C-alpha cells in the first residue's frame, strides 16, 4: 500500500514538472515575439526631461531639462 502511494506521488511530481517546463518554454517564445519587449520607448528631441529619475528616458541625452 505504501509503495503504491510512493509511486503515485513520484508520477504526479514528474507530470507536474514536465507540464511546468513546457509552459515555461512557451512563455519564453511568446516573450521573444512580443512587440513590447522589442520596442523601447523614449522621448524625442525637444520634449521636457528630468534626468535619471524620469520613467521614460530620452532617445538621446537630457540637457537643460530638454531631450536632445
UniProtKB/Swiss-Prot annotation:
Its main location: secreted. GO terms for molecular function: calcium channel regulator activity; toxin activity. Residues 1-20 form the signal peptide. Disulfide bonds join 42-59, 49-62, 58-67. It is found in: Secreted. Keywords: Calcium channel impairing toxin, Disulfide bond, Ion channel impairing toxin, Knottin, Neurotoxin, Secreted, Signal, Toxin, Voltage-gated calcium channel impairing toxin. Coiled coil: none annotated. The keyword Disulfide bond applies. Reversibly blocks N-type calcium channels (Cav2.2/CACNA1B) in rat dorsal root ganglion cells (IC(50)=40 nM). Elicits no toxic symptoms in either vertebrates or invertebrates during a period of 48 hours post-injection, when it was assayed in vivo by direct injection into mice and cockroaches. Belongs to the neurotoxin 36 family. 02 subfamily. The presence of a 'disulfide through disulfide knot' structurally defines this protein as a knottin. This is Omega-theraphotoxin-Hs1a. It comes from Cyriopagopus schmidti (Chinese bird spider). The lineage of its organism: Eukaryota, Metazoa, Ecdysozoa, Arthropoda, Chelicerata.
